[in-house]
């Protein structure tokens, strides 16, 4: 069980960092092993981690991104078939730096349509995936809602 947070604003001047920090602090009981909050131009993403898969790797902490820094992922849950998906991706030439299901989900979302990703992954999950270049995000949860995803527009 982890906690995820994503906020966006029309203008940078609307950001209230104190409220965002307080919001993430409310989620700390969902993920006591690590907590991280990032702020960018007009958005913020946070995560509180309960380390189950790849527990000793700081590289698996979230929000998750790569060297390019275009995409960001905050994810709660477990992808049951991530090892099989990872083997398939490795056979296609994709490189990994962690042993986490988070990175598998990240690479899938970065390279394939959301529809195909949701059809491929099996598990319980909620996530937000942000594309910095397009200034757009995708929020999704598993089909049964085992992992909650609350949002407001």
Residue ranges and their predicted role:
Residues 1-153:
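N-terminus-centric sequence/structural signature that marks the extreme N-terminus
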